[in-house]
Amino acid sequence: MALSEVLSMVAQLGYYEKVTGILGVVSIILLFWKLNHEPFYPALPLAGEPPQRRWFSLSNRLRYYNDCAALFDEAYHTAYAKKGKAVLVPSMGVHTAMIMPESAMNWAMSQPDDSLSIKKAFSELNQTKYSLGHSRYWEDPWQLDLVKAHLSSILQNLIPQLNEELAAAFSKHLGTDAENWKEIELEVIMRRVIAQATSRFIVGLPLCRDDGYLDLSYKVILGMVTTIWATLPFPDLIRAVTGPLASWQTRRNISRIQEHLEPLYQERISILESRDGQKSDPGPQDLFMMMLRFAQKKRPDEYANLGIMTRRVCAANFVAMHQSTVSVTNLILNIIGSDAEFNTIATLRDEITQVMRGTDAKGCWTKDTFTRMRKCDSVAREAMRLNFPLGTRGSMRTVLKDGLESPEGIKLQKGTTISWLASCAQVDADRFDNPQKFDPFRFSRASKDDDDDDDDDGRSTSSHTKDAFVTTSPQYLPFGHGKHACPGRFMVDLMFKIILAQLLTHYDLGWPEDYQGKQPPSVWQGELSEPPPGARILVKRRKV
């Protein structure tokens, strides 16, 4: 075909067809260049490639999507990370990730934030530049810093609120029928339950029970995830197009959330700016009120801008709701799946009943109540061990300035993001017997004699602390590690244990008949292991 004929055909195309064609050609050129360009670190080995190779083959790039678990397992066990060596692995789209050995963890955690930044790493990962309209929500995430600063002081007051909200949510979504089994799609229901419970902490009553607000909150979360998938695989030039397109509906939903928040915002502003509010406790203790108090003093421009405050609430929702929903869905599936072998449900019920006998006459929970729930703690940690909530890699950090040198002598360049193969470390056969098996009471059996680890009141002592759900280490990274470990993990701990108590005390659980008593397997999307789509369970209210 002559060039003139090609040009004639192009001329006949409409405007959108021409734009699409140009973007397609540019994408192919950029992808070809990126896939064949030498990485930042030509001296580092490439996982799955021969030693002399300096770029990833297309087949190895495709392994990231269809065989990522095996590829990363090879990088960890066989060749590099476990043996104290850094390695490069293929990542989403055109990108390459640097995996650090476990031996470098303590060094990395000790670096100042202006050298290695977790905030910059998560800003790049979550792409809020597009979904929320600005990178400030992760690069200056003061709404999350407030949780770290104040959670411990409000925790005791938060416990009965979470208990009340979870009880209401389960009754609403699971029902009270004690005669007939009800089939539910588990993750869908847990989205609603988690959204209601976490919103009690974030925005308080009555908004936490407003179905319109809760539905919009989760639509924004799913929209943020869509934006991540639409931008991360590509170079910045392509992201500038795909990011706004993928975030269009999310921005509309954020505007609708803002309408729900406006009356609450005006009410709280009135409290803070009233004379009484200045002299006494200005009222509610939820996160939104904490945010307004902080912004009034430290971020006055944001304090006066409901749009920005709304987006900070959306960022807090993303952290609190999304991963908790995935994790608790896996937890419940694992409990039902292990019940036949370990009598998991009855064992947990016995512990919950025994622990609750030690509460006051009203059955009020305390911090001490949770520390005594060692089997519940073990089952939650075991579920998190096998179902790493952040994909395969953990404790990401981005290098902010040149000249930083790792313990093994790698001169890290500005803009490089380092991470660790967390999920591989958590199923290391040198650390765990039958590491791929869900053993619900693995950690409550950690000592030879559990009774020796309790004080006279049956409370867990320091010997159990290292295996607790909230305890981080280089071998257990669902909540990160070091000074930036997730502060919200303590609320997650409370919420998961209350969920187990509410669910197992008040409901019988089982598999639908077509599952034939077997747990459906998780699915992989790239390096993400997710609950089986559409997984169903049976529930029935117990006659207690």
Curated annotation (Swiss-Prot):
The protein's enzyme class: oxidoreductase
Binding residue positions for heme: 486
GO biological process: secondary metabolic process
InterPro entries: Cyt_P450 (IPR001128), Cyt_P450_CS (IPR017972), Cyt_P450_E_grp-IV (IPR002403), Cyt_P450_sf (IPR036396)
Induction line: Expression is positively regulated by the cluster-specific transcription factor tenR and is induced during cocultures with the natural competitor fungus Metarhizium robertsii.
Transmembrane segments: 13-33
Effect of a null allele: Fails to produce tenellin, and accumulates pretenellin B. Also leads to the accumulation of pyridovericin.
Record keyword Transmembrane helix present: yes
Keywords: Heme, Iron, Membrane, Metal-binding, Monooxygenase, Oxidoreductase, Transmembrane, Transmembrane helix
EC number per UniProt: 1.-.-.-
One cellular component term from this protein's GO annotations in UniProt: membrane
Superkingdom, natural source: Eukaryota
Keyword Membrane applies: yes
Pfam families named among the record's database cross-references: p450
Region spans: Disordered: 438-467
Membrane topology value: Single-pass membrane protein
Composition bias, Basic and acidic residues: 438-448
Similarity-based family: Belongs to the cytochrome P450 family.
Role: Cytochrome P450 monooxygenase; part of the gene cluster that mediates the biosynthesis of tenellin-type 2-pyridones, iron-chelating compounds involved in iron stress tolerance, competition with the natural competitor fungus Metarhizium robertsii and insect hosts infection. TenB catalyzes the selective N-hydroxylation of the 2-pyridone nitrogen of yield tellinin and 15-hydroxytellenin (15-HT), respectively. The pathway begins with the assembly of the polyketide-amino acid backbone by the hybrid PKS-NRPS tenS with the help of the enoyl reductase tenC.
Identification of the protein by name: Cytochrome P450 monooxygenase tenB
Gene it is expressed from: tenB
